[in-house]
Amino acid sequence: MSSCPAIVNMKDDDGIGAMGAAVAFAAMGVFGIYFLWPVVGPTSAGMMMKAPGAAGWVICRAVFEANPQLYFTILRTAGAAAAAATFAACSIAS
């Protein structure tokens, strides 16, 4: 028996590196679609509208139509940013 540690072959294989890069790129694409689709999807489907009384803000049309009185109450008491943030999520309506 020898007291020397075993020699390990550390050969760099370019095929594995390219495959790993492709898998990482695909994973980033899936990650991006998963987290960005809820933001981009409803606006492209036409479910969003300009927030009344809050210039520059966009809110979910279905949520606003379900309870416009609540929107205007929040707009008067807490301001445009709070009202738009409350009515921004379209997942509540679906």
Curated annotation (Swiss-Prot):
Keywords from the UniProt entry: Fertilization, Membrane, Signal-anchor, Transmembrane, Transmembrane helix
Any Gene Ontology CC annotation: membrane
Description of post-translational modifications: Possible proteolysis of the C-terminal region from the predicted transmembrane domain to permit secretion and transport of the mature protein to the cell walls of the nucellus, allowing the spreading from the egg cell apparatus to the micropylar opening of the ovule.
Tissue expression pattern: Expressed only in the egg apparatus, consisting of the egg cell and two synergids. Not detected in the central cell, antipodals, and nucellar and integumental cells.
Matching InterPro entries: Egg_app_1
The keyword Transmembrane belongs to this UniProt entry's keyword annotation: yes
Protein topology in the membrane: Single-pass type II membrane protein
Coiled coil: none
Parts of the chain that traverse the membrane: 16-36
Cytoplasmic-side positions: 1-15
UniProt-annotated location(s): Membrane
Reported induction: Rapid down-regulation and/or degradation after fertilization.
Extracellular side: 37-94
Cited function: Involved in short-range signaling required for pollen tube attraction by the female gametophyte. Required for female fertility.
Protein name: Protein EGG APPARATUS-1
Natural source organism: Zea mays (Maize)
Gene encoding the protein: Ea1
